[in-house]
């Protein structure tokens, strides 16, 4: 019985000693602030237009940041059904960007996150910026998910045909 108690107290003492010996020392290696790592988005080939729209609706709604979720889900509900395959591709590439970058670009907060040249002439980003202005001054909430809002029966229409 005595030996079990002795082993327990030795382990506790050793563990405590190790903690005290490392007290005040950094526990993690330093982070290199110049290191930039980006995971390439998945290349999707052979998607039908309806499957692509459905995926983009999901990606617009499930960003992880509430501000982006609200802005992009309302945008998707309003415009996704009318987008052509080329416009959907552009929107897909925009969704590959970081959430806060999209949010700051949509709200034209270029001091925080400068707008890259590749998005300066983007028709989709301009439309998103217009939507972000919220001229109707409505309270933003996640729109209801309805299949008819993003499935267009495989037809392509253009955003220029959308009547606001």
From Swiss-Prot:
Principal location listed in the UniProt entry: mitochondrion
Family named by the database record: Belongs to the SDHAF2 family.
Chain's role: Plays an essential role in the assembly of succinate dehydrogenase (SDH), an enzyme complex (also referred to as respiratory complex II) that is a component of both the tricarboxylic acid (TCA) cycle and the mitochondrial electron transport chain, and which couples the oxidation of succinate to fumarate with the reduction of ubiquinone (coenzyme Q) to ubiquinol. Required for flavinylation (covalent attachment of FAD) of the flavoprotein subunit of the SDH catalytic dimer.
Protein name per UniProt: Succinate dehydrogenase assembly factor 2, mitochondrial
Record InterPro entries: SDH (IPR005631), SDH_sf (IPR036714), SDHAF2 (IPR028882)
Subcellular location: Mitochondrion matrix
Pfam families named among the record's database cross-references: Sdh5
Gene source species: Lodderomyces elongisporus (strain ATCC 11503 / CBS 2605 / JCM 1781 / NBRC 1676 / NRRL YB-4239) (Yeast)
Known partners and oligomeric status: Interacts with the flavoprotein subunit within the SDH catalytic dimer.
Gene Ontology CC: mitochondrial matrix
Superkingdom of the organism of origin: Eukaryota
Lineage summary: Eukaryota, Fungi, Dikarya, Ascomycota, Saccharomycotina
UniProt cross-references to HAMAP family, sorted A to Z: SDHAF2
Additional remarks: This protein may be expected to contain an N-terminal transit peptide but none has been predicted.
Keywords: Chaperone, Mitochondrion
Signal peptide interval: none
One record GO biological process: mitochondrial respiratory chain complex II assembly
